[in-house]
Amino acid sequence: VALIVATALAAPSLSRPVVGALGAVITRPFGAIGRLARTNSVRNPRRTAATAFALMLGLMLVTVIGVLGSTAKASVDSLVDTGVEADYILSGPQSIGVPTGATTAAQQVAGVDRTAVLHPVFVTIAGQEEYGAAIDGSPEGLLELSMVQGTADLDSDGFSVSETEAAARGWTVGTEVTFDTVDGASVPVTVTGVFTDNPLIGNWIVSGDIYQEVTPSITRSDILVLVKATPGTDLDTLRTDLEAATKPFVVVQVQDVEEFKGSQGQQIDTLLAVLYGLLALAVVIAVLGIVNTLALSVVERRREIGMLRAIGMQRPQVRRIIYLESLLIALFGAIVGVVLGIAFGWGFVQTLRDEGLGTMTVPWGQVVSMLLGSAVVGVLAALWPAVRAARTKPLEAIADL
C-alpha cells in the first residue's frame, strides 16, 4: 500500500521524463503535429499522472497475477518433472479425490507393477495443527525422495520428515514423535528418514498404517494414485486397461506425467481468467478517466485549438493531436504499471518460496500484449474528445464565445 501511495505521489514527477521520452519516439513521424501532442501531454504533469493512475493500478494488478500464475505453473511443472517417476497418475476432483474402489480396480489391472496412493494427513504435534502426507506402498520408482538420513521405506510406524522441518524441530532418525488426532487419541511414531525438501510432498510423510490410525474413516481420501508399469509392458495398452477399469468411477482421470502437468496448469489458468475478468472493470474505469480528462482538456484549450484551425490546421490534424496525447498518457500508465507489477510479483514469489514457488517467471508475451492493448485503448478513449476538438469553430473559439 505504501509503495502504491508513493507511486501516486511520484507519478507527476515521472510523467514529464517518461512521456517526453515516449513522445520523442512515437510522435517523430508526425512532425509538427507530433511535437504539439508531446508538448501538450507534458504541459500538466499532475493531470497526466492522475489520468494514467487508474490504468497504471489496473495493469499493475494484472501483471502481479500474471507473474504469480506463470511462476506457479512453472513450479508445478518442475516439481512433477523432478519428483514423479510414475508412468500414470490417477486423479479426481479436489473435493473428493480418487474413489477407493477406483484405486483397487487400478491395482488389479494386468501390467501394473506397483502403485502408491497419496493421502492428506491432519494431526496435532506439540499443540500445533500440522498438515502432511501419507503413502500406501513404497515410493521407490514412483516418487523421487532424496534421503539425507535413514531410509525412504516406511514401516508400520514409519515417519520421514523434510530436512528443514527436522532442523527446525531438532528431529533426527530415531526421534519419537506423538501425533494427536481429532478423536483425542495419541499415536506414537518414529522418525525413520530425513529427505531433501520436496514441496510436492510437504514437510513430512507417514505410512498408510499410521494414516489409518490418525484419520477418521469418514474423512479419508485418496489424493493421487501413482502407477508404475511392469518392465516390458506396452504403456498404451496399460492406459487403455486402466481407463476401462476405472470407467465406472466417472470422476477419475488417467493421465501421464505431461497430461497431469497440463491439467494442473489449466486449473491455474481458470483461476486467473476469473481474476482477469474482475480486473477488466479497472481498465474500463481507466478508459473513462482518460475520456473525461481529454474532454476537459479540449474545453480548456478551445481558444488554442481555434487559433490552430484559423492558421490552417485541418480537422484530421486536430484529431491526430488528441489521439497522440491519449496514446502517450495510456502508454505512460501501462509502462509504470507493468514495472510495478513485476516488482510486486518478485516480492510475492520470494515470500511464497517456502510454499513451493520456484524461480520467478515473467509472462513476457502477456506483458507485450498489455502494452499494445493499452496503446489501442488510449486511441479508442480519444475518439469522442478528438471529434469534439475537430468540430471547434475557429472564429467563435478565438472570440471565446
Predicted region positions:
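Short helix-loop junctions at transmembrane helix boundaries
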Residues: 1, 321, 335-373, 383-396
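Juxtamembrane segments of multi-pass membrane proteins
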Residues: 7-165, 173-175, 183
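Hydrophobic positions within alpha-helical transmembrane segments of bacterial inner-membrane proteins
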Residues: 8, 12-13, 55, 59, ...
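Cytoplasmic membrane-interface segments at the C-terminal ends of transmembrane helices
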Residues: 8-42, 294-310, 380-399
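Alpha-helical membrane-protein architecture signal
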Residues: 30, 34-38, 49, 257-267, ...
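Small-residue transmembrane helix packing/gating motifs
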Residues: 83-84, 197-240, 249, 255-258
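Peri-transmembrane interface segments
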Residues: 248-284
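Interfacial "coupling" helices/loops that link adjacent transmembrane helices in transporter permeases
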Residues: 286-334
